[in-house]
């Protein structure tokens, strides 16, 4: 693997068509390893002299924010210097020159900034449900497993097992274990395919580290934020939503909320972070594991705009689908509201739609401008009235299917983004039940006549 990666960097100096294997913008361990291993496989199995280059979809300066990535690269003895990052290759220039073919791994929707590259996408390999509205018109291979690295391991072991070296096997093995929470049946993130390929890798390379050792090491590295500034912690695992120019950042924080709130100069850091990136609000969702290795979740909303902050807090506090079961924590600062989250199965993935609806409800119910943090002439009673209208607008706008999704969730590759089987069983409408009963009643006479014969 290391020799291959060194060759990739050299290939970029040549003016020739290249195939770029591109991971997602989060560049978590699964995305990074899947891109590296899939590009390695394609380069080794393609007869023509084509160049396959894995690209990590972040700036090089952002890699230190991903502690598990840095730790694993060091453990596997892959120097960071041989990796290629998004700010080191101009994909748009290559595309305009007709020299780019894209292969997307661990995602299938390009961001708006890369929309022009969609016509260069030749293949997709992903492990999450397809968004048909934005999926590129190309060969798409999707299977709902716990880790995308499992699908890459499958392709290698089925297509060319002889090319698999210990270094690549160790990368795949550790990544699957981390994504699938050490194959813990109680967590339920690992599918049969995930388990199968972990066992296959262990059989081929018996000297791989024990499951417990590598999982514990990777999880510790992932949750280690001791050396990060507040800004780095907020950027480490962040998503952004927006509506009508209003932007809300949602950051996963890997530590106890109490410790996070006690950081020196925190409020100034939060304000500076929002101003630097033009965020109108920031939602911090903390996750850590207690002494019983159970996940603990907490949540905080920082927003200098009173009406927007109260709308967001009200929607989150009163949400029943999903129920966050929030308990407010007293705060001495009016711009910040923290909560204990009683329902630990509700991850950021489930909170994002609530925040989208909160923004919609806010704009539907009030014309209060966001130009200033506090709007003069707006009383608390007026804000409360607007909040009630926003909440009613949201609740009335939710369809039955939105309140209770019809299928259990797909296992994802991070505890931050998904927990297993927390949406309940499929729900039938009255029309569906009536149709089923009608079909049964129509079939009964036929069945009866046949029995008489």
Swiss-Prot record:
Residues 393-420 are annotated as: Essential for homodimerization. Its cofactor is Mn(2+). GO terms for molecular function: exopolyphosphatase activity; inorganic diphosphate phosphatase activity; metal ion binding. Mn(2+) 1 binds at residues 28, 106. SUPFAM superfamilies: DHH phosphoesterases. Binds 2 manganese ions per subunit. The modification Phosphothreonine is found at residue 410. Its EC number is 3.6.1.1. The modification N-acetylmethionine is found at residue 1. Mn(2+) 2 binds at residues 30, 106, 179. Disulfide bonds: none annotated. Residues 396-419 are annotated as: Disordered. Keywords: Acetylation, Cell junction, Cytoplasm, Hydrolase, Manganese, Metal-binding, Nucleus, Phosphoprotein. It catalyses: diphosphate + H2O = 2 phosphate + H(+). A motif (DHH motif) lies at residues 106-108. It is found in: Cytoplasm; Nucleus; Cell junction, Focal adhesion. The modification Phosphoserine is found at residues 399, 414. GO terms for cellular component: cytoplasm; focal adhesion; nucleus. Activated by magnesium ions and inhibited by manganese ions. Inhibited by dipyridamole, moderately sensitive to IBMX and inhibited by vinpocetine. Belongs to the PPase class C family. Prune subfamily. Phosphodiesterase (PDE) that has higher activity toward cAMP than cGMP, as substrate. Plays a role in cell proliferation, is able to induce cell motility and acts as a negative regulator of NME1. Homooligomer. Able to homodimerize via its C-terminal domain. Interacts with NME1. Interacts with GSK3; at focal adhesion complexes where paxillin and vinculin are colocalized. This is Exopolyphosphatase PRUNE1.
């Amino acid at each position: 693997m290391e020799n291959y990666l060194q060759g990739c960097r050299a290939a970029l100096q040549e003016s020739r068509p290249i195939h770029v294997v591109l991971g997602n913008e989060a560049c978590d361990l699964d995305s990074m390893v899947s891109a590296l291993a899939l590009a390695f496989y394609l380069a080794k199995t393609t007869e023509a002299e084509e160049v396959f280059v894995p690209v990590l979809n972040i700036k090089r300066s952002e890699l230190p924010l991903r502690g598990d990535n840095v730790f694993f690269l060091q453990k596997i003895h892959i120097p960071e210097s041989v990796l290629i990052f998004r700010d080191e290759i101009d994909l748009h220039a290559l595309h305009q020159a007709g020299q780019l073919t894209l292969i997307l791994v661990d995602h299938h929707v390009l961001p708006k900034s890369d929309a022009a590259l969609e016509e260069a996408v030749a293949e997709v390999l992903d492990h999450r449900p397809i968004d048909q509205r934005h999926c590129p018109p190309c060969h798409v291979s999707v299977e709902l497993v716990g880790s995308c690295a499992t699908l890459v391991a499958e392709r290698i072991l089925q297509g060319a097992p002889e090319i698999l070296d210990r270094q690549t096997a160790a990368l795949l093995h550790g990544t699957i274990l981390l994504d699938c929470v050490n194959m813990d049946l109680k967590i339920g993130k690992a599918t049969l395919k995930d388990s199968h390929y972990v066992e296959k890798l262990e059989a081929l390379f018996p000297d791989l580290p024990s499951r417990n050792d590598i999982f514990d090491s990777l999880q510790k590295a992932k949750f280690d934020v001791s050396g990060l500034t507040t800004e780095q912690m907020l950027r480490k695992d962040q998503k952004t939503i927006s509506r009508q120019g209003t932007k809300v950042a949602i950051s996963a924080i890997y530590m106890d909320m109490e410790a996070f709130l006690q950081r020196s100069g925190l409020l100034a850091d939060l304000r500076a972070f929002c101003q630097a990136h033009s965020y109108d609000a920031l939602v911090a969702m903390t996750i850590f594991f207690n002494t019983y290795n159970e996940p603990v979740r907490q949540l905080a909303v920082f927003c200098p705009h009173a009406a927007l902050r109260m709308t967001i807090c009200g929607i989150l506090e009163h949400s029943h689908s999903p129920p966050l079961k929030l308990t407010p924590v007293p705060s001495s600062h009016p711009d910040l509201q923290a909560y204990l989250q009683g329902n630990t199965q509700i991850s950021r993935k489930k909170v994002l739609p609530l925040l989208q609806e909160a923004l919609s409800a806010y704009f539907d119910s009030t014309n209060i401008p966001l130009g200033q943090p506090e709007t003069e002439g707006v009383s608390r009673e007026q804000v409360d009235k607007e909040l009630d209208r926003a909440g009613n607008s949201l609740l009335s706008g939710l369809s039955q299917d939105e309140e209770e999704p019809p299928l259990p969730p797909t296992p994802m590759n991070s505890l931050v983004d998904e927990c297993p089987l927390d949406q309940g069983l499929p729900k039938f409408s009255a029309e569906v039940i009536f149709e089923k009963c009608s079909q049964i009643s129509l079939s009964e006479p036929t069945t009866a006549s046949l029995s008489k014969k």
